[in-house]
Amino acid sequence: MKRTVFILIGMALCLVLAGKVQAQRCLPGMKGLRLTAGMTDGFHSANRRNELGYHFGLSMDSYTKGCSKWVFGAEYLQKYHPYKDMRLPVSQFTAEGGYYYNFLSDANKVFLCYVGGSAMAGYETVNWGESLLYDGARITDGDAFVYGGAVSLEIETYLTNRTVLLLHARERCLWGGGTGNFHFQFGVGLKFILD
């Protein structure tokens, strides 16, 4: 009888406490792999189709104290420039390393807001290295190494204990290329917590 009472009390405690257990989030040293994608230099519309671009990124986050984080990764950006009846692609392959400071979060760490800065370096190619166009015109801007940085604003919300939805906006400023220094990006992403 005594054994049955202990088992019933144990089962009741498990049922009562099961909804109150939460995973620990943003612990120092915790890492996450994130995939991001989005638009570059404006919103997509039919009349701006030839001027816009897109980006994809893969990076690793490492959390520090206070839910801030270090971010290291790579990104691919492609932007188009209209020319007569075609569009010329400008592609950038960049690596980045930066720090994102958590300035707002709720008590359970489900919703977090970050502001961050990153150093960036990479390579830019104009029309995939083809300088001569179909009509005989020549592109004067060639392929080049680019360097600079980015300022980012990011929002994270946990979907599960190991899956995070990201919303981001950033302004990139890169020198060395001949097609413009500033590019605004916005997009979404998913992060998968590894540790």
Cite the ranges covered by each PLM segment:
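Residues that define the transmembrane beta-barrel architecture of outer-membrane proteins
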Residues: 29-31, 50-56, 89-95, 111, ...
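Short glycine/proline- and aromatic-enriched beta-strand/turn motifs that initiate or cap beta-hairpins
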Residues: 21-73, 187, 191-195
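Extracellular loop and loop/strand-boundary signature of outer-membrane beta-barrel proteins
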Residues: 43-46, 81-88, 135-141, 172-177
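Bacterial N-terminal signal peptides
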Residues: 8-16
